[in-house]
């Protein structure tokens, strides 16, 4: 558990699967005796309610040891009018793998952005959405601040269950660096 009271959710009980079929390696990673490690990061409030914060494998660990939960930040960004979806990722700044800055790819609806913010050109759209990101940054601890923005009208790469494929999206970003970046 970290300093914010967030840790991996582990469960046991009669409705929990007894293991992965013919996959001993996966069983070793996921099971600790009777306890199943879900891979979900969760927090329990004072009343005992469990809140899922994100996935363990998607956490971005900063040089100061602080954790960024992309799903938490994406939910904030996705509330911006004209934003269809977003993808938070860490961009490495030096040889130190934990020296990262938080960036976001925003998939936007051009028509809605034009109507809501009277933004027509790519630069006007960038300015309108950057202003909204700055407002969100003002509500977050400084270490969580979004430092870079990529705009796209193309949907994010997702699984058949509509979950963001984080590595594939990051690979696409690294491949196509000619995207409008601020």
Predicted regions and their residues:
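C-terminal boundary motif of the adenylate-forming
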Residues: 41, 46, 80-110
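Conserved C-terminal helical docking segment of ANL/AMP-forming enzymes
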Residues: 67, 81-85, 110-151
């Amino acid at each position: 558990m970290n300093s914010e009271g967030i840790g991996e959710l582990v469960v046991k009980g009669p409705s929990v699967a007894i293991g992965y079929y013919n996959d001993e390696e996966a069983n070793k990673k996921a099971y600790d005796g009777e306890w199943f490690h879900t891979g979900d990061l969760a927090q329990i409030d004072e009343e005992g309610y469990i809140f899922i914060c994100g996935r363990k494998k998607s956490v971005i660990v900063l040089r100061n040891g602080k954790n960024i939960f992309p799903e938490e930040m994406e939910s904030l960004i996705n509330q911006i009018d004209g934003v269809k979806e977003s993808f938070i990722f860490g961009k490495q700044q030096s040889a130190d793998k934990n020296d990262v800055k938080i960036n976001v790819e925003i998939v936007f609806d051009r028509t809605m952005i034009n109507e809501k913010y009277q933004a027509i050109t790519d630069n006007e759209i960038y300015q309108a959405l950057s202003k909204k990101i700055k407002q969100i940054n003002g509500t977050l601890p400084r270490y969580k601040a979004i430092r870079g923005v990529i705009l796209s009208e193309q949907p994010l790469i997702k699984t058949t269950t509509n979950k963001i494929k984080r590595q594939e999206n990051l690979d696409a970003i690294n491949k196509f660096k000619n995207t409008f970046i601020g």
